[in-house]
Each structure stands twice: as structure tokens, then as C-alpha cells.
């Protein structure tokens, strides 16, 4: 996490990570996004409002979704968890792949770069960038 936070935010920062199951994640997703389904990761950024904040935000990760996606993608749950933490931290930095195609491309390219630095190159080779 230190590597991710230093690359994305430039200095020592903190983030909270809450690991839960699909049932609770569905409730959180409904409460905070109005979507009545589980999701892999949710993020709450404090950095977007205050760039001087030491605590940049909170992440919730569904272990059930991590395991399901790992199986679908053909890698282990540890690799998928790292991918979700990278993805969530990119959201904390202010990026959102749902806002526009350009931002989706930017976010996925950044995720690929970070994952490569973490020793996981080529994870998105099977998912071409938009």
C-alpha cells in the first residue's frame, strides 16, 4: 500500500481498507450508490476535497467478489485483491472510469503501470484498453 499511496499522492498517506462479504457489500452499494447489487470495491475519497489530507480515504472490498473474479480471470485471489486495491486507490485519487471513455482509458493505463511495478505485468492483456 505504501508504494501505491506514494505513487498516486506523492508523499506519505494512509487509507483504510475494510474487507467484507457480498451481502454487506450489496447493502453498502445500495446505500452509497443506489445500486442493489454487490460490487468488488467501493471508495470514499477525502483527498479530492482536501489535497493536504494525510488520510486519503476508505476502501471496502468484497472478498466474495474478489474470489469470483479471480476464478473468472484465471489467477489467484491474492492477485485479484492487489488489483482491487490498485483500482480502489486510483478512485481515491479522483479517477473514475464511469465518467468518460477518456478517463476509463487513463485509469486503466495507470492501473497497468502500477500493477507492473508491483510485479504483476500484463494482467489487462486479456482486457484490451478502450
Language-model features, listed with the residues they occupy:
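An acidic/histidine-cluster motif and surrounding catalytic segment
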Residues: 1-82, 89-130
Amino acid at each position: 500500500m505504501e508504494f501505491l499511496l506514494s505513487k498516486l499522492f506523492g508523499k506519505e498517506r494512509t487509507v483504510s481498507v475494510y474487507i467484507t462479504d457480498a451481502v454487506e457489500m450489496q447493502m453498502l452499494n445500495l446505500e452509497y450508490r443506489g445500486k442493489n447489487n454487490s460490487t468488488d470495491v467501493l471508495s470514499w475519497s477525502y483527498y479530492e476535497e482536501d489535497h493536504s489530507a494525510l488520510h486519503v480515504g476508505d476502501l471496502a472490498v468484497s472478498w466474495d467478489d474478489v474470489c469470483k473474479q479471480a476464478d473468472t480471470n484465471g489467477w489467484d485471489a491474492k492477485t485479484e485483491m492487489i488489483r482491487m486495491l490498485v483500482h480502489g486507490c486510483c478512485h481515491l485519487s479522483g479517477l473514475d472510469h464511469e465518467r468518460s471513455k477518456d478517463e476509463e482509458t487513463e485509469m486503466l493505463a495507470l492501473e497497468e503501470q502500477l500493477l507492473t511495478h508491483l510485479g504483476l505485468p500484463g494482467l489487462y492483456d486479456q482486457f484490451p484498453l478502450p
